[in-house]
Amino acid sequence: MGLLTFRDVAIEFSREEWEHLDSDQKLLYGDVMLENYGNLVSLGLAVSKPDLITFLEQRKEPWNVKSAETVAIQPDIFSHDTQGLLRKKLIEASFQKVILDGYGSCGPQNLNLRKEWESEGKIILW
């Protein structure tokens, strides 16, 4: 079993399937794909940006993207220390998501929380 790639977590729609989605479903799809890619990047598993991510960042329709392929780096030595670091990053990203899901849409009173996270170099995933 190799390393996880973006292709492993990406969902692809045909143009016809995409046309059946309403605007909220399309936005949710974009948010989920961007979050999945962000998680792979934070774990050091993505080294190139897939075309799909570029399209989603530009809010373009993704159905004409050729490939969701992302090349993963295969470490020469996958040490116990490296495994621990990856596990820690995944836990931090998951914790951040839980915090933001709970407080991210509550309005201006949480702007300070967001600024604090950004100032500490934490990645904000919406």
Swiss-Prot record:
SMART domains: KRAB (SM00349). Pfam families: KRAB. It comes from the Eukaryota. GO terms for biological process: regulation of DNA-templated transcription. Residues 4-75 form the KRAB domain. InterPro entries: KRAB, KRAB_dom_sf, Krueppel_C2H2_ZnF. This is KRAB domain-containing protein 5. It comes from Homo sapiens (Human).
